[in-house]
């Protein structure tokens, strides 16, 4: 089987607030909240690139949909890596996220593996790493 990960869905506590954070604060393009005509169907999609969609979905609805018990999020269970083309871009995105309300957990700095990165948590505690890796080419 060839893996085809297409959608990463984040369970959020307040869909409207998270939409504002990602759309207005981080500048991610979206059509906004869709699916409101369905019971517990409201969702937000962001096209991250040709192969990946970031989705925001109410956490209680995600728990119900997946038939798992409601539990508090653990930020150390997962981090989402956003790879950029330069150290300056890392710094700019980290600053943009902090202005939008993110909590910087580890400011951008040189890393032991030769790159440069920083971490922040979004409004629901989801952990993001913004990273530049000199060994990886970033295609625009």
Identify what each model region corresponds to.
Residues 1-19, 37-39, 77-82, 134-140:
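N-terminal beta-strand motif that seeds the catalytic metal site of vicinal oxygen chelate
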Residues 4-14, 44-48, 67-140:
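Vicinal oxygen chelate
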Residues 9-61:
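Core segments of cupin and vicinal oxygen chelate
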Residues 19-20, 64, 91, 106, ...:
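Alpha-helical elements of the RecA-like P-loop NTPase motor core of helicases
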Residues 57, 66-68, 140:
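Short, charged, solvent-exposed linker or helix-capping segments at domain edges/interfaces
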Residues 57-64, 133-135:
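Acetyl-CoA-dependent GNAT
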């Amino acid at each position: 089987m060839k893996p085809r990960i297409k959608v990463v869905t984040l369970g959020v506590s307040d869909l409207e607030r998270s939409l504002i954070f990602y759309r207005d604060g981080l500048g991610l393009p979206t059509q906004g909240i869709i699916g409101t005509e369905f019971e517990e169907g409201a969702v937000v999609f962001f096209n991250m690139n040709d192969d990946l969609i970031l989705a925001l979905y109410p956490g209680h609805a995600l728990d119900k949909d997946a038939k798992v018990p409601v539990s508090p999020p653990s930020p150390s269970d997962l981090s989402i890596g956003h790879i950029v083309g330069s150290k300056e871009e890392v710094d700019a995105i980290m600053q943009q996220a902090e202005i939008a309300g993110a909590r910087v957990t580890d400011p951008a700095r040189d890393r032991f593996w030769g790159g440069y990165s920083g971490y922040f948590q979004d409004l629901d505690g989801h952990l993001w790493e913004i990273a530049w890796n000199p060994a990886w080419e970033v295609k625009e």
